């Protein structure tokens, strides 16, 4: 079998907005402030930009985890911009996040209100992986290479 270097054809051009990735996930939640607190305090992400409305309500935040960004937006009523909590549906995607300690992050997420869907277990490809639903309805596969 031929060894493949998956990064041979990766575009090396910098993004026009410094600090952004070429592909960024954008999610919608009812309370951006609570979501930012959960992602930064529990999951050890960093909020690098926040935008408030005139009343001081947080509407938007750009969050970073080990060089990858995602955006947290305020869900809007009567709009297609809804959170899984609004729709009572399973999200159509799952975040796959690598960490240094799956068991610790799983426990910390559960203690902060996430629901464990699958306890940490070894996968055939060599990851220890757990699946959780965060308090905002999004699913996370938390993994570490073992």
Language-model region placement:
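Vicinal oxygen chelate
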Residues: 2-26, 37, 43-100, 106-133, ...
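Short acidic-aromatic low-complexity motifs
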Residues: 29-33
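C-terminal catalytic core of tyrosine-transesterase DNA break-rejoin enzymes
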Residues: 136
